[in-house]
Amino acid sequence: LCLDVGQGDGFLLRSGTTNILIDSGSSDQKKLGSRTLEPCLKSKGISRLDIAVVSHGDSDHISGLLYLLEQKMPIDLLILPAGGKGGEIYGQLEQLQTEAGGKTYYMHQGDKIKAGEMEFTCIFEKETEEERNAHSLVLCSHYKDLHILFTGDMGISEETELLDLAEENGSIQQEHLEHVQILKTAHHGSKGSSSPAFLEAMPLKAAFISYGKDNSYGHPSGQVTEEMKKQNISLYETGGKGAWTLESKARNVIIKRTVKSRGEN
């Protein structure tokens, strides 16, 4: 489920009884946690999470999760970027998780985690980069025949580094990129991410772009959306269109709208 969080990011993955949240924050929905995220989870009968992943610590990726942690929602494992260890916001998240009785792990490039039938591999992460967007976790999720790439707010510089690593035969970057069908577009479709070379490196069928309608940043960039259309990548945008459900059945993937955005007729 690609959540409609306004100007931010949020993805909920489910397989059987396994529930995983990847980011959940917004810069324009000040009560995202209580008004959107918590009601969404309750409507699906979710009272605990197996894993919550923070790609990086910007508020438009964590504000909803912060609320859940403050409410002491049970989260078995909180995953944070190793590059952010020692940063104030990551320390705050870790402390709240500890107080709620859960474990925290700082993820490194090459790490793998399994949850139910889902497997997650970190294929890129800058451990020495202080700038949050640049140390975003880049995760490839693998569920049966479905591969999704989650990119946080990585920029073109990081994409280039990732592609350089992928040129090495047998590398985890090459192994995973060549199978990615679905992309969670970096940085809300900003022109500072999603270079043509990066998009071309994957056999992409679809891309999700999460952003707030009429946002002041100009997201998504027309340059990015036009390039995706040029490469025959189907676009699924939250701004003005709401949340999207992605369902994997056998070898088929079904994507459909689920919730209308606020103010939409």
Please describe what each predicted stretch is.
Residues 1-265:
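Non-globular, low-confidence helical/coil segments that flank catalytic cores
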